[in-house]
Amino acid sequence: MENLIIYLLAYLIGAIPFGLLLAQIFAKTNIKNAGSKSIGATNVLRVVKESNPKLAKTLAVATVILDALKGVLPILMAKFYGFDDNILWTMAVLAVFGHCFSPYLKFEGGKGVATGAGVLAVFLPFEIICALLAWFIIGKVFKISSLASLGAMIVLIATSFIFHYDIPVINTHAPIFIIAFIVVYKHIPNILRLIGKQECKVI
């Protein structure tokens, strides 16, 4: 029962739509009705930038940080209280699932990139550093957020087999692949636009 409560909390906290809330509170804008209609930092930047470019950058950065922390903090708290990595990895997956399929938004949500990066940073810090470098380079060259995110995810998966061929305690890369699958699934419209060379440049 205790584990079920922890899992539920990880999901519900991960489901908090910080991007949507920040845009509504500070920019008086409903990002669910504009841009890509996603609740993530990229859409916050895209939509709010039309009326207030400076505020857009601030809110986008805040969204990234909060979306990452909502996955990280529950895991760190559970780790502090002695829960093992099997439970912590399950919490990580549920946090990303909550962000992407939020019960507060009729099970819609964001793309899971910031939350996924946050939870994976707890377990795979070196891999996340490599992924962030890839995200920065791809974003700088192509200026397409979705392409940078997908490229970074590929780098993370590849480097996870280099730095952690056997994931400690759980001895499987399954949670990483589940998180990656969720992120790719939420990026399907972006992937189709990338193939059709219609994806918008943002970063």
From Swiss-Prot:
Keyword Transferase: yes
Primary location class: membrane
Lineage: superkingdom: Bacteria
Keywords: Cell inner membrane, Cell membrane, Lipid biosynthesis, Lipid metabolism, Membrane, Phospholipid biosynthesis, Phospholipid metabolism, Transferase, Transmembrane, Transmembrane helix
GO-annotated biological processes: phospholipid biosynthetic process
Transmembrane annotation, as ranges: 5-25, 58-78, 87-107, 118-138, 150-170, 176-196
Pfam family, one: G3P_acyltransf
GO cellular component: plasma membrane
GO function terms (MF aspect): acyl-phosphate glycerol-3-phosphate acyltransferase activity
Membrane topology: Multi-pass membrane protein
Compartment annotation: Cell inner membrane
InterPro entries listed in its UniProt record: G3P_acylTferase_PlsY
Enzymatic reactions: an acyl phosphate + sn-glycerol 3-phosphate = a 1-acyl-sn-glycero-3-phosphate + phosphate
EC number: 2.3.1.275
Pathway: Lipid metabolism; phospholipid metabolism
Function: Catalyzes the transfer of an acyl group from acyl-phosphate (acyl-PO(4)) to glycerol-3-phosphate (G3P) to form lysophosphatidic acid (LPA). This enzyme utilizes acyl-phosphate as fatty acyl donor, but not acyl-CoA or acyl-ACP.
Family: Belongs to the PlsY family.
PANTHER family referenced in this protein's UniProt entry, alphabetically: GLYCEROL-3-PHOSPHATE ACYLTRANSFERASE-RELATED, INNER MEMBRANE PROTEIN YGIH
Quaternary structure annotation from Swiss-Prot or TrEMBL: Probably interacts with PlsX.
Name of this chain's protein: Glycerol-3-phosphate acyltransferase
Biological source species: Campylobacter lari (strain RM2100 / D67 / ATCC BAA-1060)
Gene: plsY
